[in-house]
Amino acid sequence: MALLHSGRVLSGMAAAFHPGLAAAASARASSWWTHVEMGPPDPILGVTEAFKRDTNSKKMNLGVGAYRDDNGKPYVLPSVRKAEAQIAGKNLDKEYLPIGGLADFCKASAELALGENSEVLKSGRFVTVQTISGTGALRVGASFLQRFFKFSRDVFLPKPSWGNHTPIFRDAGMQLQGYRYYDPKTCGFDFSGALEDISKIPEQSVLLLHACAHNPTGVDPRPEQWKEMAAVVKKKNLFAFFDMAYQGFASGDGDKDAWAVRHFIEQGINVCLCQSYAKNMGLYGERVGAFTVVCKDAEEAKRVESQLKILIRPLYSNPPLNGARIAATILTSPDLRKQWLQEVKGMADRIISMRTQLVSNLKKEGSSHNWQHITDQIGMFCFTGLKPEQVERLTKEFSVYMTKDGRISVAGVTSGNVGYLAHAIHQVTK
C-alpha cells in the first residue's frame, strides 16, 4: 500500500512540475469519439423490440420479413434438415472456400436463375460468385459498378424500394435516383408512370429492378408489362440490375418468378443479378447468396470474374461454407430438389391463402373498403394502404405491429390470428 501511495504522490508531483503531463493525461482520458452522434434505430428492428415488450397475449408482429408456419413459429425446411444430415455424414473439413465461393453452388445458382437450358450457360458467357446473402450480392455488385461502370454513377430505384438498397449503393459511391412504381391510389403498379420515367432516364444509366415479389409493396408487373419495360431498357441502352430475393417464394414456381430476368436476357440485354436463399430455403442466418454478371462472351466473363475476386478479397476474403453446402446439396440432388420445390410452393401457397382469408374476414367484419389489392399483390409483403395514424392505432389499441408505411409481412398471419387482424383493421378504417 505504501508503494502504491508513494506512486500516486510522485505522479501528482510530476504533473504539478510539468503541466504538459497533466494536459496529456486529460487528453488520454477523453474519447476519440465524442463527436459521434447516436444513430437512428432500424425501423423494422424497432418494431420487433416494441413487440417483445408488449404483454398482450393477442399481439402480432407483422414487421419482420421471415417466414412463419401456421402456428407462427420459425420454419426449417425438411429438405434443409435432410441436406444437413447428408453433409454431416460425409465428415467434411472446414477449410476456406475460394474467394468466389463453392463452385457447385455457383453453377447451380446460375442454373436456377437463368434456366438449365439457357444459352448464356451453354456459351459460358457469365460469372457467378457466392456472396453473403442478397445484401452481400448487392454490395459486391454496387462496388463493381463503382469501380468499372464508367458511363454513369446514377442508379435508378423504384419508388419505393427495399430500404437497404439506398445505403448499399450510396455507401459504395453510387448516386441514387428514382422512378415511379407504386400507385397509392390503387395500391397497385403505376405502369404508365414507370414506363414514362424509365423512358426519360439518361442512356447508359443503371436501372434496378425487383425480379419478383417487390419489396415492400408486393406489386409486380405482368409479363406483358415486363415486355414493354424491357423494350424501353433496350432502346435506351440502360443497364438492368436485377434483385431476385424471392425466386419460387412469390408464386410457388421458380421458373415463373424468374421470367422477367430470362426475358431480358432473351432480348439481348446483358443483366446482372443478385440472389438470396434466405427466404426460399429459410437459410436466413446462414447468409447464402450469389451475384451473377451476364457478359458478351466467355473471355469477358473471365475478366469480370478476376475483378470481382479482387473486390471481394478485402471485403470478406471468402464466403461462409455451411449454407452454401446445404443449398448446393439441395439443388444438385434430384430427390432433394424435388422435395424443396414442393416445400417452397407450400410456403408460397400458405401466404396466398392468408391473403385470401384476410380479405374474406374483412368482408365478414362488414368493411366497405375495396381490399382486392391484398390478393392482387404477391410474395411475403403487402402494402395495405393503411395510413400512419391507422397503423399507430393498430399498435396502441390492438397490439398489431407493423412499419409506419402500412407494410405487413403476410408470413406473420396465421389461420389462428387472421380473424383478429381483420377485426383490428376494420376498427381503424371504418
Swiss-Prot record:
Stated role: Catalyzes the irreversible transamination of the L-tryptophan metabolite L-kynurenine to form kynurenic acid (KA). As a member of the malate-aspartate shuttle, it has a key role in the intracellular NAD(H) redox balance. Is important for metabolite exchange between mitochondria and cytosol, and for amino acid metabolism. Facilitates cellular uptake of long-chain free fatty acids.
Transit peptide, UniProt annotation: 1-29
Residue list for modification Phosphoserine: 143
Modified residues (Asymmetric dimethylarginine): 313
Post-translational modification 3'-nitrotyrosine, affected residues: 96
E.C. designation(s): 2.6.1.1, 2.6.1.7
Tissue expression remark: Expressed in all tissues tested: liver, pancreas, kidney, heart, spleen, arterioles, and lymphocytes.
Subunit structure: Homodimer.
Naturally occurring in which organism (per UniProt): Rattus norvegicus (Rat)
Keywords, in A-Z order: Acetylation, Aminotransferase, Cell membrane, Lipid transport, Membrane, Methylation, Mitochondrion, Nitration, Phosphoprotein, Pyridoxal phosphate, Transferase, Transit peptide, Transport
Protein name, entry field: Aspartate aminotransferase, mitochondrial
